[in-house]
Amino acid sequence: MRVGVTLACTECKRRNYTTTKNKKNDPNRIEMKKYCRFCQTHTLHKETR
């Protein structure tokens, strides 16, 4: 079952990306390095509720 999730920048706390994840394969929160246009650099983005 795929569900939509939002990724937030850990530096500025802005929610920049939306994506989907498979809850069966990834039961924990997702963490990805993505580009933040507000920080203007690649930062760690974490899944928000």
Curated annotation (Swiss-Prot):
Keyword terms, alphabetized: Ribonucleoprotein, Ribosomal protein
Molecular functions (GO terms): structural constituent of ribosome
Keyword Protein biosynthesis found: no
GO cellular component: cytoplasm; ribonucleoprotein complex; ribosome
InterPro entries from the UniProt entry: Ribosomal_bL33, Ribosomal_bL33_CS, Ribosomal_bL33_sf, Ribosomal_zn-bd
Family matches, as Pfam families: Ribosomal_L33 (PF00471)
SUPFAM superfamilies: Zn-binding ribosomal proteins (SSF57829)
Superkingdom as given in the UniProt entry: Bacteria
PANTHER family attached to this UniProt entry: 50S RIBOSOMAL PROTEIN L33, CHLOROPLASTIC (PTHR43168), LARGE RIBOSOMAL SUBUNIT PROTEIN BL33C (PTHR43168:SF2)
Protein name: Large ribosomal subunit protein bL33
Annotated source species: Pelotomaculum thermopropionicum (strain DSM 13744 / JCM 10971 / SI)
Gene name per UniProt: rpmG
